[in-house]
Amino acid sequence: MKVRVHELAKKYEIKNKEFLEILKKDIGITVTSHLSNLDEDQVNKIDDYFAKMNMLKVETVEPVKVHKEKKEEKPIRKIMDEDENDEGEGYSQKNNKKAKFQQTKNKKNNNITFEEDGNSHKNKGKKKKGRRTDFILKTVEATPDVVEEDGIKIIKFRGELTLGDFAEKLGVNSAEIIKKLFLKGQMLTINSPITLSMAEDLAADYDVLIEEEQEVELDFGEKFDLEIEDKAADLKERPPVITIMGHVDHGKTSLLDAIRTTNVVGGEAGGITQKIGAYQVERDGKRITFIDTPGHEAFTDMRARGAQVTDIAILVVAADDGVMPQTVEAISHAKVAKVPIIVAVNKIDKPEANPMKVKQELMEHGLVSAEWGGDVEFVEVSAKQKINLDGLLDTILITAEILELKGNNKKRAKGVVLESRLDPKIGPIADILVQEGTLKIGDVIVAGEVQGKVKALLNDKGERVNNATVSQPVEVIGFNNVPDAGDTMYVIQNEQHAKRIVEEVRKERKIQETTKKTISLESLSDQFKHEDLKELNLILRADSKGSVDALRDSLLKLSNDEVAVSIIQAASGAITESDVKLAEAAGAIIIGYNVRPTTKALKEAEVSKVEIRTSGIIYHITEDIEKALAGMLEPEYREEYLGRIEIKKVFKVSKVGNIAGCIVIDGKVKNDSNIRILRDNVVIYEGKLASLKRFKDDAKEVVAGQECGLGVENFNDIKDGDVVEAFEMVEVKRTLK
């Protein structure tokens, strides 16, 4: 009969952690945890050990039976009037403390969904009076944070946990945990985050197990029950969505421009597409949607976002340049997004073009041409000369047919925000790619914590349209604020429903932001106490939210263990007077990307001596900040050998001490040299010279073959025959790389 480790530990009144050590060190039994099973021979061996130690009487231990508790389904709670208190429904009431804890955690982790109740049989045909009951808040049962198995308490560890929350789960006072950590040399507060390893170490003292559990976040639509199931009859063929990827200046935008026969290249800076745009073209009566993603590696996240909404990735590689770093990066994003890749070998019109080299280099990254037995289509094109563009479009349409892409235009629309901005005359504008349904003028829409009503739709040519169907990109005017790029947009039944959803999203994000800010403030305080860590404060301004996100991520990646970038504030729009005042208070530098400071901001910056740096090229900004951070690094020094001196005779000089008569046998010695004294090849002292003389005169430098006299700082035990090594410490310029 098998017995669990914790049962024997309980029997001998020993803590699980100590019991495991005894098993391993003293008895020779290795187990993984308190819940491990022991066979009869092992149990007898343990009993014999403790019998010899004369610790406790041996008692028969019966294995604990596991009783599975039936989970009760959480009831559906309707949203009542604001003054109605429905707190406490659907939560465990086993005991007051546990009920309170369970209630708090469920409120935090339950997934909230909204349902429409207007079609239920019970309410059909009845006129509702009083408060609204057609809008239901449904709670989905969440996994409990604390469970008990075989008499052992198990805490589920999800993501980040504060010390206070962990103490509550353990059922002990926070002060006790703080004291334990203090004795281990860790100073934490009740709001400090704790790591998984810290939690495991602490829990072992209380015979509690920690089980790591990955958080599974439902997306926006699942949380609020906005996803509508498609009927097979409604699914029709839809245009493919294409993302163009590749290295800087390999011709991505030029290729798209050639396909569209419009000029969007001229206004760009530094050869890089700075914003995501989406456009549609037509080939043989079929439409193709192109998403043009930025080409520089700093826009990694924006490119990844483009790959997530795309069906096919076009990898543009210059025939005269071959595979480059951003080419490899683009391949990775396409593979993560699990989308097929078509390689467009561009610039074949150039004399130095070598398409064969491109194919060979891409083979090393898993892209094998269909001609060579692989599954990747290679199309040789020239955007400049408009060579074989039809062949590329045909390849796209053939690939789309194989994928059997379908969409439903007969339901409420769902889309993704590709880009957003605030127009001073029109207001908030969002570039939306419709992914499901049909978006119409007058639709009530929600994207993240922003809502609105569609006032106008503009297609990629800037023409007003009444609706947008699946895979169609449009500019949407009507949001009450600027939505975040990457947010999913949904059409909601009415404005009341939209408002309630936005309120829930706002509350949820506010909780997350508050938690992040608290942790950030604490870590900031710790950093200031830690003198070895230096910080560069920045305020960021850019022309759009997507650019802000890309710039922030690029700059934060420059941080390391010694120097850190701290983003005090980041937003889209012009640099304002308030930005300058904030920078002055925080000791920050203001960075502007594709934006300029206002007149008032410039005057304020001049008075307060706040530095403002602006650029239209993102990598110029990152290079400047990288140089600034490198200057903040503590200098590194390298020892540089100067020479070797042999002591011939030591003279005692009153009021001065011992002076050595020497000869420089190799290299040279300077009057400010660092030295080490060797006796029988053993270093007996290391320090600096106090004096260096030649013919009774002070000397700055003595070279090999010359005699000299020297005195050593704070050392008088020089003897004949000692050897002195002279060296200097040379500062080595450091970089962040």
Curated annotation (Swiss-Prot):
Biased composition (Basic and acidic residues): 69-80
GO terms (BP aspect): translational initiation
Region (Disordered): 69-130
Superkingdom as given in the UniProt entry: Bacteria
Region (G5): 382-384
Keywords: Cytoplasm, GTP-binding, Initiation factor, Nucleotide-binding, Protein biosynthesis
One Pfam family recorded for the sequence: IF-2
Region (G3): 292-295
Gene3D superfamilies: 1.10.10.2480, P-loop containing nucleotide triphosphate hydrolases, Translation factors, Translation initiation factor IF- 2, domain 3
Chain positions covered by the region annotation G1: 246-253
Residues noted as binding GTP in the record, renumbered to the chain: 246-253, 292-296, 346-349
PROSITE patterns in alphabetical order: G_TR_2, IF2
One of the record's GO molecular function terms: translation initiation factor activity
Gene Ontology cellular component list: cytoplasm; cytosol
Similarity comment: family membership: Belongs to the TRAFAC class translation factor GTPase superfamily. Classic translation factor GTPase family. IF-2 subfamily.
Protein name: Translation initiation factor IF-2
Gene: infB
